[in-house]
Protein backbone atom coordinates (compact mmCIF):
# COMPACT_ATOMS: atom_id res chain seq x y z
CA UNK A 1 0.00 0.00 0.00
CA UNK A 2 2.78 2.39 -0.93
CA UNK A 3 0.28 4.92 -2.31
CA UNK A 4 -1.02 5.42 1.23
CA UNK A 5 2.04 7.61 1.77
CA UNK A 6 1.19 9.79 -1.22
CA UNK A 7 -2.40 10.15 -0.03
CA UNK A 8 -1.14 11.23 3.37
CA UNK A 9 1.15 13.78 1.76
CA UNK A 10 -1.78 15.19 -0.22
CA UNK A 11 -3.47 16.25 3.04
CA UNK A 12 -1.34 19.37 3.20
CA UNK A 13 -0.12 18.52 6.68
CA UNK A 14 1.69 15.89 8.71
CA UNK A 15 -0.28 12.65 8.37
CA UNK A 16 -0.07 9.72 10.76
CA UNK A 17 -1.73 6.52 9.58
CA UNK A 18 -2.07 3.14 11.25
CA UNK A 19 -3.90 0.20 9.67
CA UNK A 20 -4.50 -3.28 11.12
CA UNK A 21 -6.57 -6.16 9.79
CA UNK A 22 -7.32 -7.85 13.12
CA UNK A 23 -8.18 -11.32 11.86
CA UNK A 24 -5.60 -11.24 9.07
CA UNK A 25 -2.90 -9.89 11.38
CA UNK A 26 -1.68 -7.56 8.63
CA UNK A 27 -0.91 -3.91 9.10
CA UNK A 28 0.60 -0.77 7.68
CA UNK A 29 2.01 2.33 9.37
CA UNK A 30 3.18 5.82 8.47
CA UNK A 31 4.55 8.03 11.25
CA UNK A 32 2.98 5.55 13.62
CA UNK A 33 4.87 6.70 16.71
CA UNK A 34 4.73 10.45 16.16
CA UNK A 35 2.63 12.60 18.49
CA UNK A 36 -0.62 14.01 17.09
CA UNK A 37 -3.27 16.20 18.77
CA UNK A 38 -6.41 14.11 19.28
CA UNK A 39 -9.08 16.78 19.67
CA UNK A 40 -12.40 14.93 20.15
CA UNK A 41 -10.85 11.53 19.48
CA UNK A 42 -9.97 11.62 23.19
CA UNK A 43 -13.67 11.12 23.94
CA UNK A 44 -13.26 7.46 22.97
CA UNK A 45 -10.83 6.81 25.86
CA UNK A 46 -13.17 8.73 28.18
CA UNK A 47 -16.02 6.40 27.21
CA UNK A 48 -13.79 3.38 27.86
CA UNK A 49 -13.02 4.68 31.35
CA UNK A 50 -16.66 5.14 32.34
CA UNK A 51 -17.84 1.85 30.88
CA UNK A 52 -15.03 0.06 32.70
CA UNK A 53 -16.10 1.79 35.91
CA UNK A 54 -19.62 0.50 35.27
CA UNK A 55 -18.31 -3.02 34.62
CA UNK A 56 -16.60 -2.97 38.02
CA UNK A 57 -19.67 -1.66 39.86
CA UNK A 58 -18.12 1.70 40.71
CA UNK A 59 -20.79 3.68 38.86
CA UNK A 60 -24.05 3.01 37.07
CA UNK A 61 -24.83 4.41 33.66
CA UNK A 62 -28.16 5.62 35.06
CA UNK A 63 -26.46 7.94 37.57
CA UNK A 64 -27.54 11.52 36.87
CA UNK A 65 -25.33 14.61 36.87
CA UNK A 66 -26.55 18.19 37.19
CA UNK A 67 -25.70 20.76 34.52
CA UNK A 68 -26.51 24.47 34.59
CA UNK A 69 -26.76 25.79 31.04
CA UNK A 70 -25.64 29.29 32.04
CA UNK A 71 -22.25 27.84 32.98
CA UNK A 72 -21.68 26.61 29.43
CA UNK A 73 -23.10 29.32 27.17
CA UNK A 74 -20.02 29.50 24.93
CA UNK A 75 -19.34 25.76 24.71
CA UNK A 76 -20.29 23.52 21.77
CA UNK A 77 -23.20 21.37 22.93
CA UNK A 78 -25.94 20.00 20.66
CA UNK A 79 -27.10 18.11 23.76
CA UNK A 80 -27.88 21.22 25.82
CA UNK A 81 -29.61 22.88 22.89
CA UNK A 82 -32.40 20.34 23.30
CA UNK A 83 -33.33 21.68 26.75
CA UNK A 84 -35.24 24.88 27.54
CA UNK A 85 -34.68 24.86 31.32
CA UNK A 86 -31.43 26.15 32.79
CA UNK A 87 -30.79 23.37 35.31
CA UNK A 88 -30.96 19.86 33.93
CA UNK A 89 -30.05 16.38 35.09
CA UNK A 90 -28.59 13.96 32.56
CA UNK A 91 -27.53 10.34 32.98
CA UNK A 92 -23.96 9.23 32.45
CA UNK A 93 -25.33 7.01 29.67
CA UNK A 94 -26.74 9.99 27.78
CA UNK A 95 -23.57 12.01 28.35
CA UNK A 96 -21.51 9.17 26.88
CA UNK A 97 -23.80 8.92 23.87
CA UNK A 98 -23.41 12.67 23.36
CA UNK A 99 -19.60 12.63 23.40
CA UNK A 100 -19.38 9.63 21.07
CA UNK A 101 -22.09 10.44 18.55
CA UNK A 102 -21.90 14.25 18.27
CA UNK A 103 -18.65 15.11 20.08
CA UNK A 104 -20.47 17.20 22.68
CA UNK A 105 -17.96 19.36 24.60
CA UNK A 106 -20.13 20.10 27.63
CA UNK A 107 -20.87 16.40 28.12
CA UNK A 108 -17.14 15.74 27.83
CA UNK A 109 -16.10 18.20 30.52
CA UNK A 110 -18.93 17.18 32.86
CA UNK A 111 -17.77 13.58 32.56
CA UNK A 112 -14.14 14.53 33.10
CA UNK A 113 -15.14 16.38 36.27
CA UNK A 114 -17.07 13.34 37.47
CA UNK A 115 -14.01 11.16 36.82
CA UNK A 116 -11.80 13.47 38.88
CA UNK A 117 -10.08 15.22 35.98
CA UNK A 118 -8.14 14.28 32.84
CA UNK A 119 -5.22 12.70 34.78
CA UNK A 120 -7.57 9.99 36.10
CA UNK A 121 -8.59 8.95 32.60
CA UNK A 122 -4.99 9.24 31.44
CA UNK A 123 -3.75 6.91 34.18
CA UNK A 124 -6.49 4.43 33.34
CA UNK A 125 -5.52 4.27 29.66
CA UNK A 126 -1.85 3.88 30.61
CA UNK A 127 -2.85 1.00 32.90
CA UNK A 128 -4.10 -0.83 29.81
CA UNK A 129 -0.55 -0.81 28.42
CA UNK A 130 -1.12 2.14 26.08
CA UNK A 131 1.85 4.43 26.70
CA UNK A 132 1.96 6.82 23.73
CA UNK A 133 -1.01 8.94 24.79
CA UNK A 134 -1.54 11.93 27.07
CA UNK A 135 -4.93 13.20 28.24
CA UNK A 136 -4.23 16.28 30.34
CA UNK A 137 -6.60 19.12 29.38
CA UNK A 138 -10.36 19.63 29.10
CA UNK A 139 -12.35 21.03 26.19
CA UNK A 140 -12.76 24.27 28.16
CA UNK A 141 -9.00 24.60 28.57
CA UNK A 142 -8.38 23.97 24.87
CA UNK A 143 -10.95 26.60 23.92
CA UNK A 144 -9.34 29.14 26.26
CA UNK A 145 -5.79 28.51 25.05
CA UNK A 146 -5.48 26.98 21.57
CA UNK A 147 -1.85 26.01 22.20
CA UNK A 148 -3.11 23.36 24.62
CA UNK A 149 -4.75 21.51 21.72
CA UNK A 150 -1.39 19.81 21.26
CA UNK A 151 -1.31 18.65 24.89
CA UNK A 152 -3.92 15.90 24.43
CA UNK A 153 -1.86 13.80 22.05
CA UNK A 154 -1.64 10.21 20.88
CA UNK A 155 0.42 8.24 18.39
CA UNK A 156 -1.45 6.45 15.58
CA UNK A 157 0.03 3.14 16.74
CA UNK A 158 -1.24 3.66 20.28
CA UNK A 159 -4.74 4.61 19.17
CA UNK A 160 -4.96 1.61 16.88
CA UNK A 161 -3.73 -0.65 19.67
CA UNK A 162 -6.45 0.76 21.93
CA UNK A 163 -9.08 0.18 19.26
CA UNK A 164 -7.93 -3.42 18.82
CA UNK A 165 -7.87 -4.17 22.56
CA UNK A 166 -11.36 -2.73 22.83
CA UNK A 167 -12.77 -4.61 19.84
CA UNK A 168 -11.30 -7.93 20.94
CA UNK A 169 -12.98 -7.63 24.33
CA UNK A 170 -9.83 -7.15 26.40
CA UNK A 171 -11.04 -3.94 28.07
CA UNK A 172 -14.80 -4.06 28.66
CA UNK A 173 -17.43 -6.69 29.29
CA UNK A 174 -19.10 -8.18 26.22
CA UNK A 175 -22.22 -6.11 26.97
CA UNK A 176 -20.40 -2.79 27.20
CA UNK A 177 -18.12 -3.60 24.27
CA UNK A 178 -21.23 -4.10 22.14
CA UNK A 179 -22.81 -0.95 23.57
CA UNK A 180 -19.88 1.29 22.73
CA UNK A 181 -19.57 -0.23 19.26
CA UNK A 182 -23.26 0.55 18.76
CA UNK A 183 -22.77 4.16 19.83
CA UNK A 184 -19.69 4.59 17.63
CA UNK A 185 -21.50 3.11 14.64
CA UNK A 186 -24.22 5.71 15.17
CA UNK A 187 -21.79 8.65 15.21
CA UNK A 188 -22.98 11.44 12.92
CA UNK A 189 -19.75 13.45 12.71
CA UNK A 190 -17.26 13.11 9.86
CA UNK A 191 -19.43 11.54 7.15
CA UNK A 192 -16.81 12.45 4.53
CA UNK A 193 -13.84 10.95 6.39
CA UNK A 194 -13.46 7.19 7.02
CA UNK A 195 -16.96 6.55 5.67
CA UNK A 196 -16.72 8.96 2.76
CA UNK A 197 -15.78 6.61 -0.10
CA UNK A 198 -16.83 3.24 1.35
CA UNK A 199 -19.96 1.37 0.25
CA UNK A 200 -22.96 2.88 2.02
CA UNK A 201 -23.74 -0.41 3.76
CA UNK A 202 -20.30 -0.62 5.40
CA UNK A 203 -20.35 -0.76 9.20
CA UNK A 204 -17.96 1.86 10.57
CA UNK A 205 -17.65 2.38 14.34
CA UNK A 206 -15.64 5.59 14.71
CA UNK A 207 -14.84 8.81 16.55
CA UNK A 208 -13.66 11.98 14.86
CA UNK A 209 -11.58 14.88 16.09
CA UNK A 210 -11.44 18.36 14.59
CA UNK A 211 -9.81 21.66 15.45
CA UNK A 212 -10.88 25.02 14.20
CA UNK A 213 -8.98 26.79 11.44
CA UNK A 214 -6.83 29.79 12.34
CA UNK A 215 -7.13 33.12 10.49
CA UNK A 216 -4.04 32.21 8.47
CA UNK A 217 -5.65 28.94 7.36
CA UNK A 218 -3.92 26.46 9.67
CA UNK A 219 -5.92 23.45 10.84
CA UNK A 220 -4.26 21.84 13.86
CA UNK A 221 -6.11 18.52 13.61
CA UNK A 222 -8.42 16.63 11.27
CA UNK A 223 -8.83 13.09 12.57
CA UNK A 224 -10.92 9.95 12.32
CA UNK A 225 -10.31 6.63 14.05
CA UNK A 226 -12.41 3.51 14.01
CA UNK A 227 -13.19 -0.08 13.20
CA UNK A 228 -14.43 -1.00 9.73
CA UNK A 229 -16.17 -4.30 8.98
CA UNK A 230 -14.87 -5.73 5.68
CA UNK A 231 -16.87 -7.86 3.21
CA UNK A 232 -14.75 -10.91 4.09
CA UNK A 233 -15.82 -10.64 7.73
CA UNK A 234 -12.51 -9.22 8.91
CA UNK A 235 -12.30 -6.03 10.96
CA UNK A 236 -10.01 -3.17 10.13
CA UNK A 237 -8.70 -0.87 12.84
CA UNK A 238 -7.81 2.42 11.17
CA UNK A 239 -6.38 5.62 12.61
CA UNK A 240 -5.80 8.70 10.47
CA UNK A 241 -4.45 11.86 12.12
CA UNK A 242 -3.73 14.97 10.02
CA UNK A 243 -1.84 17.71 11.85
CA UNK A 244 -1.03 21.32 10.96
CA UNK A 245 -2.53 21.36 7.48
CA UNK A 246 -2.97 24.48 5.39
CA UNK A 247 -5.28 22.66 2.98
CA UNK A 248 -9.03 23.16 2.89
CA UNK A 249 -11.46 20.92 4.73
CA UNK A 250 -12.50 18.99 1.62
CA UNK A 251 -8.85 18.15 0.87
CA UNK A 252 -8.15 17.01 4.43
CA UNK A 253 -11.30 14.94 4.71
CA UNK A 254 -10.79 13.57 1.22
CA UNK A 255 -7.35 12.28 2.17
CA UNK A 256 -8.84 10.39 5.13
CA UNK A 257 -11.55 8.93 2.90
CA UNK A 258 -9.02 7.81 0.28
CA UNK A 259 -6.85 6.12 2.91
CA UNK A 260 -9.90 4.25 4.20
CA UNK A 261 -10.96 3.27 0.69
CA UNK A 262 -7.52 1.92 -0.25
CA UNK A 263 -7.18 0.04 3.04
CA UNK A 264 -10.69 -1.39 2.62
CA UNK A 265 -10.05 -2.52 -0.97
CA UNK A 266 -6.59 -3.95 -0.25
CA UNK A 267 -7.50 -5.84 2.91
CA UNK A 268 -10.77 -7.12 1.44
CA UNK A 269 -8.87 -8.55 -1.53
CA UNK A 270 -6.16 -10.06 0.65
CA UNK A 271 -3.41 -8.21 -1.21
What kind of region is each of these model predictions?
Residues 72-109, 118:
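Conserved catalytic neighborhood of penicillin-recognizing serine enzymes
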Residues 22, 61-78, 115-116, 183:
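Acidic helix-start/capping segments at beta-turn-to-alpha-helix junctions
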Residues 52-71, 118, 122, 173-177:
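Short, well-structured active-site flanking segments
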Residues 14, 88, 109-171:
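Mid-domain, small-residue-enriched loop/turn segments at the edges of structured enzyme/sensor domains
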Residues 25, 37-65, 238:
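Active-site SXXK
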Residues 16-20, 29, 45, 66, ...:
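Soluble periplasmic/extracytoplasmic beta-strand elements of cell-envelope proteins
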Residues 1-7, 27, 113-114, 118-119, ...:
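Structured C-terminal helix/loop/strand segments within mature extracytoplasmic catalytic/sensor domains
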Residues 1-34:
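Beta-lactamase-like hydrolase cores
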